[in-house]
Swiss-Prot record:
Species whose genome carries this gene: Emericella nidulans (strain FGSC A4 / ATCC 38163 / CBS 112.46 / NRRL 194 / M139)
Full protein name: Chromosome segregation protein sudA
Main location: nucleus
Coiled-coil residues: 177-522, 684-1091
Family: Belongs to the SMC family. SMC3 subfamily.
GO molecular function terms listed in the Swiss-Prot or TrEMBL record: ATP binding; ATP hydrolysis activity; double-stranded DNA binding
Keywords of the record: ATP-binding, Cell cycle, Cell division, Coiled coil, Mitosis, Nucleotide-binding, Nucleus
Length: 1215
């Protein structure tokens, strides 16, 4: 362990915080000018280690604070950081931070940043090796000089101090002080014993006269006890009689009171039932009026339906005759259309075949005429040209023109083909559309029937929902037991009335409950419930009374035990309680006591386990989640059958005990009880409030359900009505769509016919274009062949022959074409006639007849007699149901009225019984008051008798039996005689015996105490002897060690010399003989008390010459001897580190080197740390680390410097 670092602030010359760089664990040297702050640095360390500056006054503390320019320093501190790697400090940490802080009014220590006392710091330092008896690990300026100038006697005192004799002296002084106190006590005891012996002699003479007085007094007390005891027994007997009468009367009164309370409850129930029946009667009257209104409306609707049914029946015959005529016309037109379509179907294939043959003949004719025309053109053309060149030129021009024409024709051909494709696509779309319209018109009757069925189904669904909206099954809950159909809206109106009544009951129950607590608590509980709803707090459970149930037998006991705790609010955690309390405080909404479950702590109790006790908590039914709250309130209470048993268990087990009636005994012995009015029960009030709240919430929830059901029914009805309207609209569209459909079909047919005609025209045009294109291509081929042939003015023979053949073929082809064209024209004419007849005559006629058929069917559907008959049956059934319901309502009203009459009679009888019970209770109450007055007077007499008996004091045994059978008059006479005899002893000291006994006991006690003091004095004498012996041994042992170390160290410092310590005794003063105790084998023949001093004898030049006393040496030699003595003391009692302040100031150069080398040797060999200040260079040469102190602007600072800088500074100081 060593000093690792020092931090100074505000101490003497160190104003600002000065953090000194860590010290070396070996040898550290500090240099600086005089007045720079070196000594203040050492003073700071001594300030912390308490070597000095122990008991500081205000002025002394002020002197330690820095004084300089600027703001005044109000506090200062010095902090030393020790390296504790060797764990000499028992802290378990590698470092120890010790700080001392002072101010004008404070002086405190801290260990590792924690406050500590001065004793703690001193004990810790001593445990690490800082000896209180050896302060020489710190050597300030002047201490070496003081050792040099010490007298031999002072040096002996120093040796004793190092040996630790101060401890022995302190314990010896304490022992002597105790011995002095013991002697003083012994003297006082002797004085008291003398006084007691004198007083006992006086009391011995008074005992005989006192003995006679006591005999007469004993007789008096026996007689008085007999009289008082008999009077006490008479009073007790009379009190028992009164108590028996009271108990019997109380039981009768309790029975009558219970009957009275039960009668009041029954009357309240009857009144509630009467009110409910009357309310039911009002509801039934409303039902009856509404049912009669519905019956009138249903009868009116039935009459209208019957009238409509008759009208439909009259119109049905005329409709059937018109339909027969229409059916005949429709059949004739359909037959004609079928004939025409059959003929057209046979004609169309023949027409197509004839047309194909005509097209083939025309193609052959066109081809032959084209070839003949080319040959004629060639024949006439060749005559125009002179040579082949002209011909070829013309041919090439023609080929070019024809190719251009071919391109143009091909373009027209492509466009025509596209037009044909478009028309075919249109036809492909029109044909299925036309077919669909035809099928739609043909199937229109089925569609109308299907739509009619859907419309009827929608009507049935609408009527069913309307009935469901009007009527529901709802059981009656009060007087009547019948179940009748109620209307939802009517039930909703009833629930509104019930809700208002329930809300009023809740308000009444809340007012009743609030009267049982203070106003602020009532407001607070209401506010907590509101806050819970508004903020949706889950951990707020409710008041304690709301969280449990109990049997009525134990209700009074539970209320008495809980008291106002019934209204404490149970929450899950204190955080929840804090949150609610903050809101309550902000709103100023009353006061509430919370019970946070996480903060409640219950201790296990020794509950009695017996047949006549029951733990109260076992009689409560509650959720185990609230166990802590109920244990906190009820866990320490038991239920006992009576107050006597309760008192016994309360005293023996330290619990609270109560009876079922509410009488209570707590563990401190207090008894409470009396009458409890069960009609003012807080638990009943809480239960009543909870009941009406549940009723209110139930009815409110039912009202919400009804409204929701009504809304759902309204939505279903709206949806059904919408669906019905949609279907009726669809039916109307179907009924009215006959004309538009047929018009659309005609339009589609016309368009389709037009497109077919266009298609035929386009196809004919396409064939013509293809023929023209083929002719142009043949022409180009012929021109190209002619271009490659030789030039001739006339046709060749082959061409002439071909021309002749073509002329004959063209005539034949033309005749064939004309025959085929005639056949095709004939067939086409017939086909056109049939198509026009169908399109212009028969199909329109058919459409007209079908439209008329649909109209007839529509007219028949609108007056559907079946639908009217179904509506007639439905209305008849509704009237029957209404009649049945009216009969049930009448019956229910009659039953409700009978029940009201019956309950009213019962209520009147109960009221008469209650009046009689009240009179009986009042009469007994008056009797009880008289009995209580008698009991009070007798109890007072009994108390006086008991007080008189207690005044008699301790009675002899014969007092209880001696006059047991003696007549009371005789006892009174004897008492009179005894009192007369006692008058003669009025002057007697009645406390002589008591005083004699007290003085005897005191004498024995004092004698025993004196013997103890004698033994204590012997023990103290023995202790003083032992302490003296140990002190002598410690001094002799210390001298031997210091003497041996002094000789060794002196020899190291002065190798050529020799030094030793010499003990001086009283017997040596005349002879001046020296007694060298250096030899360890020599026995001590003289007591330490004979020691008068310690001398130093040294020789600096020889080990054998005569030695000199220290007084004979020079100043430097004296300082060296003093240092050798310091080193010897330190060697005997090593410290963790050493502080030397300019110890080499007065040494010669050669000895300074030796001292410096000694410090280095000790540091290396013992791992001791040295922190030294010096003005000499010798220590700097062996130092491991050098520091320089400077003084600037009236403040000191200390920094690390190199050895060279330190040496330079020392040299400058010399110059």
């Amino acid at each position: 362990m060593y000093v690792k670092q020092i931090i100074i602030q505000g101490f003497k010359s160190y104003k600002d915080q000065t953090v000194i760089e860590p010290f070396s664990p070996k040898h550290n040297v500090i240099v600086g000018r005089n007045g720079s702050g070196k000594s203040n640095f050492f003073a700071a360390i001594r300030f912390v280690l308490s070597d000095a500056y122990t008991h500081l006054g205000r002025e002394e503390r002020q002197a330690l604070l820095h004084e300089g320019s600027g703001s005044a320093v109000m506090s200062a501190y010095v902090e030393i950081i020790f390296d504790n790697s060797d764990e000499r400090f028992p802290t378990g940490k590698p470092e120890l931070v010790l700080r001392r802080t002072i101010g004008l009014k404070k002086d405190e220590y801290t260990l590792d940043r924690k406050n500590a006392t001065k004793n703690d710091v001193m004990n810790l330092l001593e445990s690490a090796g800082f000896s209180r008896s050896n302060p020489y690990y710190i050597v300030p300026q002047g201490r070496v000089t003081a050792l040099t100038n010490m007298k031999d006697s002072e040096r002996l005192n120093l040796l004793k101090e190092v040996a630790g004799t101060q401890v022995y002296e302190a314990r010896r002084a304490e022992s002597l002080k105790i011995m002095h106190e013991t002697n003083s006590k012994r003297e006082k005891i002797d004085e008291l014993l003398d006084f007691i012996n004198e007083r006992l002699a006086e009391l011995e003479e008074e005992k005989d006269e006192l003995r006679n007085f006591q005999e007469k007094d004993k007789e008096r007390r026996c007689l008085e006890y007999t009289i008082y005891s008999r009077e006490q027994q008479e009073i007790a007997s009379f009190l028992d009689s009164l108590e028996e009468q009271r108990q019997t009367g109380v039981e009768d009164t309790d029975i009558n009171r219970d009957r009275f309370i039960q009668g009041e409850k029954e009357m309240a129930q009857v009144d509630a039932e009467i009110a409910e029946c009357k309310q039911q009667i009002e509801f039934l009257k409303v039902d009856k009026a509404q049912l009669e209104d519905e019956r009138r409306e249903a009868s009116k609707a039935l009459a209208q339906v019957e009238l409509q049914a008759k009208s439909l029946s009259d119109n049905q015959a005329a409709a059937q005759e018109s339909k027969a005529r229409h059916d005949e016309s429709l059949k004739a037109v359909q037959s004609a259309i079928e004939e025409r379509q059959t003929e057209l179907k046979e004609l169309v294939p023949r027409f197509i075949s004839a047309k194909d043959a005509e097209d083939a003949a025309r193609a052959k004719l066109t081809e032959a005429e084209t070839a003949r025309q080319r040959l004629y053109a060639k024949q006439g053309r060749n005559s125009r040209f002179k040579n082949k060149s002209e011909r070829d030129k013309w041919l090439q021009a023609e080929i070019k023109n024809n190719n251009a024409s071919i391109s143009s024709v091909q373009s027209v051909l492509s466009q025509t083909q596209e037009d044909i494709n478009d028309i075919e696509n249109d036809i492909a779309l029109l044909e299925p559309e036309t077919e669909r319209l035809r099928q739609q018109i043909d199937g229109r009757g089925d569609t109308i029937q299907s739509v009619e069925q859907q419309v009827q189904a929608a009507k049935d669904e609408r009527d069913r929902l309307m009935d469901q909206r009007k009527y529901v099954d709802w059981p009656r809950t009060s007087c009547a037991t019948l179940t009748i159909h109620r209307e939802l809206w009517r039930e909703e109106a009833k629930l509104d009335s019930i809700l208002i009544n329930a809300s009023n009951e809740v308000d009444r129950a809340e007012r009743n409950l609030s009267q049982m607590m203070d106003h602020n608590t009532s407001r607070g509980i209401a506010a907590v419930r509101r806050i819970k709803r508004q903020h949706n707090l889950e951990g707020v459970y409710g008041t304690l009374a709301e969280l449990f149930e109990v049997n009525d037998r134990y209700r009074t006991a539970v209320e008495v035990t809980a008291g106002q705790s019934l209204f404490h609010y149970v929450v899950d955690t204190d955080d929840t309680a804090t949150k609610v309390l903050e809101i309550l405080q902000h709103e100023k909404a009353g006061r509430v006591t919370f019970m946070p479950l996480n903060r409640l702590r219950t201790k296990p109790l020794n509950m009695p386990k017996a047949s006549d006790t029951i733990p109260m908590i076992e009689k409560l039914q509650y959720d185990r989640a609230y166990e802590k709250a109920f244990q906190h309130v009820f866990g320490k209470t038991i239920i006992c059958p009576n107050l006597q048993v309760a008192s016994q268990y309360a005293r023996s087990h330290g619990v609270n005990a109560t009876t079922p009636e509410g009488d209570r005994s707590d563990k401190r012995g207090a008894l409470t009880g009396g009458f409890h009015d069960s009609r003012q029960s807080r638990l009943d009030a809480v239960k009543n409030l909870a009941k009406w709240r549940d009723e209110y919430e139930t009815k409110k929830s039912r009202g919400s359900e009804i409204r929701k059901e009504l809304e759902e029914l309204d939505q279903l009805i709206t949806r059904a009505v919408g669906e019905l309207q949609k279907l009726e609209q669809q039916r109307h569209q179907v009924q009215n769509s006959s004309g538009p459909l047929r018009q659309e079909l005609r339009s589609k047919r016309d368009l389709l016919q037009k497109q077919n005609d266009n298609l035929d025209a386009k196809r004919r045009a396409l064939r013509n274009i293809e023929g023209n294109l083929a002719a142009l291509k043949d022409q180009v081929d012929a021109f190209e062949a002619e271009l490659s042939s030789p030039f001739h003015k006339a046709l060749t023979d082959e061409e002439e022959a071909r021309l002749e053949s073509l002329n004959s073929n063209v005539q034949e082809y033309r005749r064939e074409y004309q025959e085929l064209s005639g056949k095709r024209s004939e067939l086409e004419t017939r086909k056109s006639v049939l198509e026009v007849e169908l399109r212009e005559n028969l199909n329109p006629r058919l459409d007209q007849l079908l439209a008329q058929d649909a109209d007839i069917a529509d007219e028949d559907g609108q007056g559907n007699i079946k639908e009217t008959q179904r509506e007639q049956k439905r209305l008849t059934k509704v009237l029957d149901k209404l009649a049945q319901r009216l009969a049930q309502v009448d019956e229910s009203m009659e039953q409700a009225n009978s029940r009201v009459t019956e309950l009213t009679q019962r209520n009147a009888e109960s009221r008469r019984e209650l009046e009689e019970l009240a009179k009986s209770i009042e009469k007994h109450q008056r009797r009880m008051e008289k009995s209580m007055q008698k009991k009070a007077a007798l109890t007072k007499q009994a108390a006086e008798c008991a007080a008189n008996i207690r005044d008699l004091g301790v009675l002899p045994d014969e007092a209880f039996t001696k006059y047991k059978n003696t007549d009371s008059n005789t006892v009174v006479k004897k008492l009179h005689k005894v009192n007369e005899a006692l008058k003669k002893y009025a002057h007697v000291n009645k406390k002589a015996f008591e005083q004699y006994n007290n003085f005897t006991k005191q004498r024995e006690t004092l004698t025993s105490r004196r013997e103890e003091l004698d033994a204590s004095q012997k023990s103290i004498d023995d202790l003083i002897s032992v302490l003296d012996h140990r002190k002598d041994e410690a001094i002799e042992r210390t001298f031997k060690q210091v003497s041996r170390e002094f000789a060794t160290i002196f020899e190291k410092l002065v190798p050529a010399g020799r030094g030793r310590l010499i003990i001086q005794r009283k017997t040596d003063r005349t002879q001046r003989a020296e007694d060298d105790l250096e030899s360890e084998d020599e026995e001590a023949k003289h007591s330490v008390e004979n020691y008068v001093g310690v001398g130093i004898s040294v020789s600096f030049n020889s080990k054998h010459d005569d030695q000199q006393r220290i007084q004979q040496l020079s100043g430097g030699q004296k300082s060296l001897c003093a240092l050798a003595l310091v080193f010897a003391i330190q060697a005997c009692d090593p410290a963790p580190f050493y502080l030397f302040d300019e110890i080499d100031a007065n040494l010669d150069a050669q000895y300074r080197t030796a001292v410096a080398q000694m410090l280095k040797t000790i540091s290396d060999s013992t791992n001791g740390q040295f922190i030294c200040t010096t003005f000499r260079p010798e220590m700097l040469h062996v130092a491991e680390k050098c520091y320089g102190v400077s003084f600037r602007q009236k403040a000191s600072t200390i920094d690390v410097v190199s050895r060279e800088e330190a040496l330079k500074f020392v040299e400058e100081q010399k110059s």
